[in-house]
């Protein structure tokens, strides 16, 4: 498992460390997930959660106030409160504050909306923070926002890429940012790779970013960001 920071570029600090699944030879999450059968999704999802908490706590994340961001599979959760027990046990063992755990899910995964809302509301009641990942690349982003407002929305890297030179992308990102501001949801732009993209996003008012410009994922370590 690797960690990549999410940066507050205004305060120049790490807001969160995102736990990223990696294979034994460094394969990315997409490859690893493609090897998981439907029957194994629940066990895999549970293992990823507890491993992320154990590793992050061992690296000192629990004590520095930053969030731990964990990606979860909504279709692997059959009943929210039953499926969260191992996560709560792991957090308890590690003395990891529940309010410092952020659960991300991607809108590209087809999932029953009522089921997803049940998960998100249960997690919020426990004290976890929530985020929609890859916003703008999936099926139901705006419709979901009408029913549930997460703490964060991560704008998809395909919209961020070349935002400084692509007028259409810039207009779309600006529009999404206005909607999120109206809903009091914090925006995170992911996949920021160039100084020009960074400057364009700053001009649009973005303060939370993630990408290779700041730090690449670090295997079993907390990557230290560099600043443009």
Residue ranges and their predicted role:
Residues 65-69, 100-104, 127-131, 152-154, ...:
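Structural preference for beta-strand elements that scaffold enzyme active sites
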Residues 8-13, 106-110, 139-228:
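EAL-family c-di-GMP phosphodiesterase catalytic domain
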Residues 58, 91-92, 121, 142-144:
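Short, flexible, glycine/charge-rich loop motifs used to bind or transfer phosphoryl groups or to couple energy/partner
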Residues 1-94:
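Bacterial c-di-GMP phosphodiesterase EAL domain
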Residues 55, 62-64, 79-83, 87, ...:
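Solvent-exposed, well-ordered amphipathic alpha-helical segments
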Residues 24-47, 75-82, 92-127, 158-179, ...:
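EAL-type cyclic di-GMP phosphodiesterase domain
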């Amino acid at each position: 498992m690797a960690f990549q920071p999410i940066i507050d570029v205004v305060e120049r600090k790490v807001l969160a460390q995102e736990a990223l699944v990696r294979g034994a030879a460094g394969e990315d999450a997409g490859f690893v997930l493609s090897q998981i059968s439907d029957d194994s999704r629940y066990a895999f999802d549970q293992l990823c959660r507890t491993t992320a908490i154990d590793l992050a706590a061992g690296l000192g994340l629990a004590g520095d106030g930053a969030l731990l961001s964990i990606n979860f599979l909504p279709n692997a959760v059959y009943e929210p409160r039953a499926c969260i027990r191992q996560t709560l046990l792991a957090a308890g063992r590690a003395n990891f504050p529940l309010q410092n755990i952020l659960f991300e899910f991607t809108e590209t995964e087809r999932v029953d909306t009522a089921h997803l809302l049940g998960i998100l509301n249960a997690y919020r009641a426990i004290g976890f923070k929530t985020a929609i990942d890859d916003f703008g690349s999936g099926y139901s982003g705006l419709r979901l926002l009408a029913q549930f407002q997460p703490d964060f929305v991560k704008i998809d890297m395909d919209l961020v890429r070349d935002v400084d030179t692509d007028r259409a992308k810039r207009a779309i990102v600006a529009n999404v940012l206005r909607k999120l501001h109206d809903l009091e949801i914090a925006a995170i732009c992911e996949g920021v790779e160039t100084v020009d993209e960074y400057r364009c996003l700053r001009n649009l008012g973005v303060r939370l970013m993630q990408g290779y410009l700041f730090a690449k994922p670090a295997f079993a370590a907390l990557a230290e960001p560099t600043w443009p």
